[in-house]
Every structure is written in C-alpha cells, then in structure tokens.
Swiss-Prot record:
This protein's UniProt keywords: Cytoplasm, GTP-binding, Ligase, Magnesium, Metal-binding, Nucleotide-binding, Purine biosynthesis
Chain sites annotated for binding GTP: 12-18, 40-42, 306, 332-334, 414-416
Gene Ontology molecular function terms on file: adenylosuccinate synthase activity; GTP binding; magnesium ion binding
Cofactor requirements of the protein: Mg(2+)
Task performed by this protein: Plays an important role in the de novo pathway of purine nucleotide biosynthesis. Catalyzes the first committed step in the biosynthesis of AMP from IMP.
Cellular localization per UniProt: Cytoplasm
Annotated protein name in UniProt: Adenylosuccinate synthetase
Family that this chain belongs to: Belongs to the adenylosuccinate synthetase family.
Entry-linked SMART domains: Adenylsucc_synt
C-alpha cells in the first residue's frame, strides 16, 4: 500500500485538517513534517470540534501513532498547552501515541519576541504577515547551526554551552534592534521548566518510521500551510520559513524520497490568503465579502480575516507540478452554492502579453492581471452531498473544468466540515 502525503495547493487554510482526519482512518501513523504552531486546523467529529496547531490530526483517533518530525520547529510550551486542551476534551495523549523527533528544533521565548518586534517594525507594504510565534527566527537558528534541539534538554551538563552559542548571535542582534539582552539563566530556566513535560515523547523518529515502512504500515504525512507559501516555490518574500511542497515530507521526517507515495493536494473551490503578498484573483467587492462570510474565513489561530477571490487555476496547476501532486481534494464547494456565475482564472496578462504561469519576480507578480473564464453557477445545493448524483449538473461541470485546467484529477470532494460529507473518487491509500 502507498503512503500518502497531504499538502495545501494554495496559500494554506484549504481544509487539510478534515481531509487528513478522513484519511487517518486508514493510516497507522500520521506525521507532521514541517512548520510549527502557526498553521491551525479545525477537525469536526460528530458534535466535537478540535482546534489543533502543532499536534498531528491523527492524535484525535484512538489507535493511531502521531509523529512530529525533525522538519518541524517546536514550541514546547505550546505543545504542553495544546496537549492539555485536547486532553480536557477527552483525547488521550501519551508517549505511546505521540512521538517527537529527538533532533527537532525548539522555539524559545526570544524567538517569539524577535518575530513580533520585526513584524511590528516593518513598514506598510513590506509586512510579511507573520503570526509572530517565532517560527521564522527558529528556522534561522536551525540553518545557522545554533539552535537548541529537543535532545539538548536531555543533556543538561552541556546546555549552557549551547545557550551561549545561541546568544552569541542574538545578543548583538537584539542590541541593534533596541532590545535588552536575554540572560543565559532565563533561557536555561525556561528549558528546565518544560524539559520533563516533553522529553518523554522524544524518539529517533527516522528509525521508527523506517521500521514501520518495512513492516508495511500505512504512513500519512501531514503538511502545514500551502505550497504557495513555500520558501523556494511560493510568493517570496511573502512566504513561510520552510519548504511546504511534498518533497519535504521525506526530509522533514527522516525517510528517503521513495517512501512518499501518493501526493494529495488540497484546494478550495475558490481562493483565500492571510496576510500580505500578491493575490491576482482577490475580490474587494461584495462577492469577496460573500465568499468570506459564507466560508467563515477567519484564521483558526489568529482570528484574522482571510482575503478571498476566485479559483486560480494557473497557481494550482503550478503547485501540481512543484509538489508532484497525483490528485486533488477539492474543498468548500458548497460555499459557491447560489452564485449566478462563477469565474476561474485561466491565465494572466503581464505587460500586455498573456502568460500561463505565475512569475517568480516580486515586481512582475504585482503587475499581473487575471484572465477569467466565466461559468454558469447553480441554484441547487451541494452542502452535505456524499455522491455525484446529489450534485447539481453545473457543479459537476465546474469540478470537471477545474480538473482540465489544473491537469490533475479530483480524488476527493468535500461538501461540508463534517468528515462524512465527502465524495470519494480515488482512495489515495488503495488506488
């Protein structure tokens, strides 16, 4: 059986949580492989609503192993809080069903402070739209080879040396920003406080996953955010600090690339974005407002209102290529119910010429204008549909046209936040 990687095919918030939860029924292990607690997702199971940010979605499913891989940056205090929150909802979290890579990078208080200060000090038009949770600064320390990693908490005798190495960078940086230096003792106290709460979950994740792979276990890799926020392939610099494309499932978990298997991209039937950056199909009118209101487009973690626009087939086709997507899960089709006409971006105009890809240049990205194809909407409802027969004819035409434009089949269709309201075309674990 193939393993499955789930990645966002837009700018995040595509509904990955529901799809991962749906797929986790057939998975043995669910792995988070990048990002941090900056990308929240909501799971609706029966009458219970779970809001997760760091824990893999499989944690709410009994009998599943959840894994946080080395590609994640981990805020240990947030982890403790999130475990406590879902435990209060009746979810059992123990070292038996949650494993964290021993070489995962930790987010510290100084990372959060630095992140918030930088974003607040940014001038208008340059703000990245960070969640101010320390994700970027933690990744900077990781690639700068000065990060504190989870395994370091298990070696307190050498911790001071590692903190000093970290502060050798942060002290002059903070002085330049007008911030007070952080005493070594404060960081040590922060780490000593949380160490006994998180160390029991530590494991050599790469070895554990390789053993599971050899034993024929089904592994589901859960991406955070979306491919258009990838630090290399996204709308740079308005991106996140990690690689969000499917290939990072291997690097961020410690497995080889052959372990990835089927790649499922998640895309809304329209487009949303949080924070700054280019958005060719963004709507500033009543239609955009209607999409946002009907889709409840507010961030799970931040509560920020999301920008809304029509489906951009050019961008999704691009992420199909850069992530090697085999099939798409199309979500929130029901939000388009009742629109008399629906537009889809099929190309761009750049300086008077038509182009069929999104340019890498920030200046060129700002100059493109969308070329739309207008389709007839539908008066019937798709909400709660669980088979093609329940969909209006025009809704089916819309889905089929999207498949043609993005050059990938729709494997799953989601028609509400409820897990059961899903139309299965291809099972990624079986087909």
């Amino acid at each position: 059986m193939a393993n499955v990687v789930v990645v966002g095919a837009q700018w995040g918030d595509e509904g990955k949580g529901k799809i991962v939860d749906w797929l986790s029924i057939e998975a043995d292990i669910v792995v988070r492989f990048q990002g941090g607690h900056n990308a929240g997702h909501t799971l609706v199971i029966g009458n219970q609503v779970y809001k997760l940010a760091l824990l893999p979605s499989g944690i709410v499913r009994p009998g599943k192993l959840s894994v946080i891989g080395n590609g994640v940056v981990l805020d240990p205090h947030h982890l403790v809080d999130e475990i406590a929150k879902i435990s209060a909802q009746g979810v059992t979290v123990t070292p038996d069903n949650l494993k964290i890579a021993d070489n995962v990078t930790l987010i510290l208080a100084l990372h959060r402070e630095l992140d918030a200060h930088r974003e607040s000090a940014s001038v208008a038009g340059v703000k990245i739209g960070t969640t101010k949770r320390g994700i970027g600064p933690a990744y900077e320390d990781k690639v700068g080879r000065r990060a504190i990693r989870l395994m370091d908490l298990a070696e307190p005798d050498s911790l001071d040396e590692k903190i000093d190495r970290l502060l050798a960078h942060h002290d002059p940086l903070r002085r330049g920003l007008g911030l007070e230096p952080v005493p070594r003792a404060a960081i040590r106290a922060e780490l000593e406080d949380v160490a006994p709460k998180v160390l029991p979950y530590m494991d050599a994740v790469w070895d554990l996953l390789e053993t599971a792979r050899r034993d024929g276990k089904r592994i589901l890799f859960e991406g955070a955010q979306g491919a258009l926020l990838d630090v290399d392939h996204g709308t740079y610099p308005f991106v996140t600090s990690s690689n969000t494309v499917a290939a990072n499932a291997a690097t961020g978990s410690g497995l080889g690339p052959k372990a990835i298997g089927y790649v499922l991209g998640i895309a809304k039937a329209y487009t949303t974005r949080v924070g700054g950056g280019p958005f060719p199909t963004e709507l500033h009118d009543e239609t955009g407002q209607r999409l946002g209101d009907r889709g409840h487009e507010f961030g799970t973690n931040t509560g920020r209102r999301r920008r809304c626009g029509w489906f951009d087939a050019v961008l999704v086709r691009q992420t199909v290529k850069t992530s090697g997507i085999d099939g798409i899960a199309l979500t929130k089709l029901d939000i388009l119910d009742g629109f008399e006409e629906i537009k889809v971006c099929v190309g761009y105009l750049l300086d008077g010429e038509r182009i069929n890809r999104f340019p890498a240049s920030q200046a060129a990205q700002a100059r493109v204008t969308p070329i739309y194809e207008t389709m007839e909407g539908w008066a019937g409802t798709t909400a709660g549909a669980r088979s093609w027969a329940e969909l209006p004819a025009q809704a089916i035409k819309y889905v089929r046209r999207i498949e043609e434009l993005i050059e990938a089949p729709v494997a799953l269709l989601s028609t509400s936040p409820q897990r059961a309201d899903t139309i299965l075309v291809h099972n990624p674990f079986r087909d």
